[in-house]
Structure formats: C-alpha cells, structure tokens
Amino acid sequence: MKTLVKMMAAVVLPALAADAAELEGWWRFTEADGDEAADASGKGRAALLDTNRVWRVTDAPGGGALWFDGVTNVTAAADDYAYALVPDFEELTLSNAFSVAAWIYPEALPAFAPILVRTGDTDEWNDGFALFVGENGALAACVRGGDDAGEVSGGALATNEWNHVALTYSGTALRLYLNGVEIASRTFASRASSDAPAPLGIGTLVGRRRVQPFAGAIADVRIWSSALSASQVGDAYRQFLGETMDPNGDLDGDGMPNGWEIRYGLDPRDPSDADLDSDGDGLANLRECRLGRSPRAGARPARPSLIRSATATTL
C-alpha cells in the first residue's frame, strides 16, 4: 500500500439525492490491504483486485484510491484477469438508464486507456458501455447496442491533477461531464442497450489483451441505475472529503478558489498552502493561481499530492 499524504482525520461523504435506491455500486478503496474493495452502496458488489498489478493509496477523494503504473499493470498475453473487476455486474441490468462517476489522476493520456468498462465484446466494444481516455487527451465514452452504437468525446483531461469524470445515459441520450460540466452529448435514434454479460472493469477492459493501460490513480467510483441530472453530477463533483463545496468560493480565505485547490491537490481548508511552492519553480501557489498557471507544472510528482480531511467519518 502506498501512502501519499498523511491524513489529518477520516473522510465524511454524505449521500447524494440519487444514492438511496439507485446507487448500484460505490468503491472507495479505503481498505488497508487485501484483494477486495468493499461496496459502500450496500449492494454487496465487492471489487476484486490483482494486488500484483495495482496498489492502494491512502489519501484520495472518497478516502482511498487504486494506483496503476501503466507498466506492471499490462495484462499478460495468456492472462484474462483484470487489475480490478466487479464480477457481480454480469447480472445487473442497466438497459433503461445509468450513470457512472469517478475521480482520476492520470500520469499519462494514452488513447483508449480504460477508466470504467463493461463489455462482453473485448475486441470491438460492440456491447455495454465504456468511459475512457479519448484521442488527444480528451475524455470519451460510448454506449454500444448493435447498429446504433455511439461514442462521444470532449474536453481535455489534465495529467498529474485530479479530474472528476462522469457519464449519464437515459436510454436515448448520452452525456459526458468533466469536473462537473457537460462537455459532450449524443442522442440515439432508437434505444441503445447498455447491457453486456460481463463484469465491470476498473482501469482495464476485462479480458482485453494489448489494451492501452491506464496510468495513474482512480478513486471514488460510483454507478447508479438512473441518469443523474446535471445538478446531481455537479453535486458529485463538489462532494469532496465530506462537504458540498462551492468551487468558486474560498473556504479558507487564502485567495485561491476551492475548486482550483481541489483540482491541483491542495487543501481548501488550509490557508497555509497559498505560500507553498508545490512544484519548486520559484512561484508560490497563490501566485500561480493568479497567473492562471498549474502549481504542479514545474515538477511532475511521482504520486498525487492529495487533500487532507479535517472531519470525522460519517457513512
């Protein structure tokens, strides 16, 4: 298990409006060790981990994360086992509507690197759904259902920063969100099925050989059996370490907006990080914020620097 930043206390995560009945899976990866990640939704769909290829980190949105190095994680030619998978999703029907969301911290952006994928056709992705890294660093998603298969992509994922990614599917419309903002959509002429007789893969396309591996961290993975509204996706984005924060506000009064601090792994509750120089380029974080620059660009961290929580655990 990899420790990134010492936690000040435990994480609080209040439920979203859609959580109660429609949350089908929620993986926080907070366990200290072991080859399973518990399902915090209460549905009992544990994720199985290949601990030889994926590592745990202790500080992340939701309380923990999985780390994929993009090298060790490459599936061997004769091995179908994924880095992390949820086998119980083979029996889950999501034809009518669903939503998925996660926090990701990519070190690199190889095209078609999987984030969350459920498909029975690992060669052409012709059934099920996928949320993945698109071409040229975009975020991409697809719902496949025979002839009326569709893909959407947009935005620009940031490396060495936390990005909140989400897709919603209503049965006829697919919407893609990056950091709480809709960036692309597609309407289907007829209902496209999102079901597949396959488990859910986290950070990999289950059974796929020679797929581009995801490199970086994945945290706070959630799946709902409904299409979240834009405001609910925004709530999921702002729901970080126990509070629904206004990303444009300044909780600690240090001159840096909450959303900017979250994006770059700073603590929106700690005013002292304004004077720090996180990337060692001679400019304090506050100065970088005012210049519209990344406080992480000067020195790429080997592991993400994550926010510390100052609240107690409530689930």
Please tell me what each predicted stretch does.
Residues K2-A10:
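Sec-dependent signal peptide recognition
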Residues L16-V74, D123-W125, A184, V233-G253:
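Extracytoplasmic low-complexity segments
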Residues E22-E24, D33-A38, N73-A140, T159, ...:
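Extracellular glycan-recognition modules
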Residues G25, Q232, R238-T314:
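Extracellular calcium-associated, cysteine-rich motifs in secreted modular proteins
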Residues T51-V54, L178-L200:
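Short, solvent-exposed beta-strand-to-loop segments that form ligand-recognition rims
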Residues F68-V71, P87-F89, R144, A149, ...:
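Extracellular glycan-interaction patches encoded by glycine-rich segments
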Residues A141-H164:
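Short, aromatic/His-centered strand-loop micro-motif at the edge of beta-sheets
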Residues E161-R175:
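Localized edge beta-strand/strand-to-loop motifs within extracellular or lumenal beta-rich domains
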